[in-house]
From Swiss-Prot:
GO terms for biological process: translation. It comes from the Bacteria. Signal peptide: none annotated. This is Small ribosomal subunit protein bS18. Disulfide bonds: none annotated. One of its GO terms (cellular component) is cytosolic small ribosomal subunit. Keywords: Ribonucleoprotein, Ribosomal protein, RNA-binding, rRNA-binding. NCBIfam families: S18 (TIGR00165). The gene is rpsR. Binds as a heterodimer with protein bS6 to the central domain of the 16S rRNA, where it helps stabilize the platform of the 30S subunit. Part of the 30S ribosomal subunit. Forms a tight heterodimer with protein bS6. GO terms for molecular function: small ribosomal subunit rRNA binding; structural constituent of ribosome.
Amino acid sequence: MPKVRQRRRKVKACKMCEMNVEYVDYKDIRILKDFLNEKGKILPRRLTGNCAKHQRMVKIAIKRARQMALLPYIKY
């Protein structure tokens, strides 16, 4: 029986922790767009490399920006 190789994921460092960001502002659209895919969905932590604390902040900021019509809910 052949051996199955397991892939090891690279652990990405949190960009927000490196920049010492304490608060993610919903009005800063340029930063928030980095955490959306091409259809406008929020990217998961394993793709962005965010820590849990900053991923929650990004999620809340994106949802607030969507409610304020600064970001679209979906892109066609």
